Structures are given as C-alpha cells and as structure tokens.
Design a protein with these regions (language model features):
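Glycine-rich beta-strand-centered segment in the early N-terminal region that forms part
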Residues: 22-38, 51-93
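Short glycine/proline-centered loop/turn elements that form peptide/ligand docking sites
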Residues: 75-77, 173-184, 217-220, 240-241
Length: 313
C-alpha cells in the first residue's frame, strides 16, 4: 500500500510516498480503507524534530493521526462493527501506523461510526482537535454565564470545536481572530470578536477568568496582563519543558498555567457525536488529493485559514 513517510527530520521536502505492507488484523482490531485523513500541528512538529523527547529519532516515520474510511476486515473478538461500515478514528501510534496511508489497522476502541450527515473529510477532522476541545472545557472547571473566557486563535480547527461546545454553558466568550475569521467566530458562538489585525488584545483593560491560547503565540507570561487575580491560562500546545515548569509556577500564583493534554476516549467522542447530531459545524477549509500531499502540508503549516485541512485518498 501507499503511505506518506519520511526518513529524517525536516520540512515538507523530506515527505515521500512509500510502498509499505498492507497490515493485517489481530483479534481486537479492524482494517480500514482510508478515504480521508486530516492534518494537525503535531504532524509537522514531530517531523521537524521539535518533539524528539516524545518521538525519538528512529526512522522511517509515518505521519497522520485521524482518519475516516470503510471497514474491510474485522478481528475475531470485535463486536459492534461490520465490514462495510463507514467509520472515523485515530491511530494508536501515528509514527508507526500513520493515518496518511491507504489502509490502517487500529483497535476497535479507537474507531466510531461516521454520521451519515457528514463527509469523510469532515469526520477525519474530528478526533484530535475535537477531543482536545472537550478536554480543555473539562480543565476550565465550573463554567457559568458569569465566566469570562478569551479564546486566542479562535477560528482554527481547535477553536471551531471549542467555541461551539462552549455555547451550551452560556459563558461570556471573546474570540481573537483575523478579519476573515470574524464571521465564523460569531457563527460558532463567540459573544465578542477582537480582530487581531486591528487591536492588540494584550493592551486592552478587560481581564478574564480563563484565557486559552490556541495559536501558541501569546504565552503565559504575556497572558497574565489580561488575567483576573484568580484565573486560568490554558496551554494546549506546550513545549516539553513547560509541563514541569507549569507545576512549579502554580505553587506561587493564583494565575494558574494549565497544560491541556488529551487522548480520544469513548466519553469524549460521545460528546462530539451528539454535537454533530445537533448541528455542529465542521468547516473543512480545503481538501487536497493524495498526490498533492506536499502542497497540503505546506498550506497547513502556513496557517491563517479557517477550520481544518484534509487529504482524500
């Protein structure tokens, strides 16, 4: 089968389509013919060597975490699925299995039936950022209509899910986005939108109970200027060194630095599936063909787009 892989750290030039053995299923696994997969920041962070502590330096490495497709084979102990089911899910180890391939084998616990109302590209956009959004809301603690929340970088894939899921809590949500993202942020539930091309959010006088930085550009040190005396800064894109440092810093301040790390689970996915049934908007900004993979990753890494980027096979 064909799969996107790389043999050394670097930019998109190191990516290549390689021939790999078609995987076979074990008793608790399913074989999925991939119809679409999506791109996440961790794909290029690992490829560029920014996460060596986690990824190691052994090659070749595959890439891609979440996918959608059709089941072609089922292990003997798998229940609840059948051959021909349209599903979406996440691979167990993106550097080994990699969703960016014609076939993936995954435990049945890491796939879910695709709602008929959404496309394969939309379904493949759910697992990583969707579960991250649910995790972030859990980290926020008790949210009510008096809770003020600032979402920086609100119209990327993470923000798309987060803004819509936050609506049910009635919190006062301010989104920071570009001029072209204002319409989307409002549609997804933001009460107020700050256009970062016209206003520096760090220079305003308003302070917040919760600040979440989805862009990775604000940082805890800067965010403290717009945080209430007792507040939370949520960081879903931490550098490895920030994880232990945040624990130490939190001992000495009421402005807490909270690291958001997530992994898909049944409870999280149930929340997302219910949201899809209730009209959750999944904006796929652009869909590329498998042969356009380098162009797709270059486009994704450049940023500045609304929603998610997907590749169809």
């Amino acid at each position: 089968m064909k799969a996107i892989a790389y043999n050394n750290f670097g930019n998109t030039d190191v990516l290549q389509i390689s021939e790999q053995a078609k995987p076979s299923v074990q008793s608790n696994q399913v074989l999925v013919r991939v119809k679409a997969f999506s791109i996440n920041p961790m794909d290029w962070k690992i490829r560029k060597g920014e996460m060596k502590l986690m990824s190691g330096s052994k090659f070749p490495k595959n890439t891609g975490a979440d996918f959608a497709g059709i089941i072609e084979a089922i292990g003997s102990s798998v229940s609840g699925f059948k051959i021909g089911d349209e599903v979406f899910g996440i691979v167990k180890n993106l550097m080994k299995e990699g969703a960016s391939s014609e076939y993936v084998v995954v435990p049945s616990s890491l796939i879910w039936k695709k709602p008929e109302k959404i496309s394969f590209a939309q379904a493949a956009s759910i697992p990583v950022v969707g579960t991250a959004a649910v995790t972030a809301i859990e980290k926020m603690g008790k949210i009510n209509p008096q809770t003020t929340i600032l979402v920086n970088g609100a119209t990327g894939a993470f923000g798309m899910f987060l803004l819509q899921l936050l609506k049910q809590y009635g919190a006062e949500v301010t989104a920071v986005a570009s001029s072209k993202g204002i319409e989307y942020a409002e549609k997804w539930g933001a009460n107020k939108v700050i256009d970062y091309t016209k206003e520096n959010v760090l220079l305003q006088k308003t302070t917040y109970d919760i600040v979440i930085d989805l862009s990775g550009k604000m940082g805890y040190k800067n965010a403290k200027a717009i945080m209430k005396p007792k507040s939370l800064f949520l960081n879903p894109t931490p550098l490895p060194i920030e994880i232990p440092l945040s624990l130490l810093k939190n001992l000495f301040t009421a402005k807490k630095h909270v690291i958001v790390l997530s992994s898909p689970g049944t409870n999280y996915t149930d929340v997302l599936l219910n949201a899809v049934k209730n009209g959750l908007d999944i904006e796929v900004n652009k869909v590329f063909s498998f042969e356009q993979y380098k162009e797709a990753y270059q486009y994704a890494e450049k940023g500045g787009y609304i929603g998610k980027i997907a590749i169809e096979i």
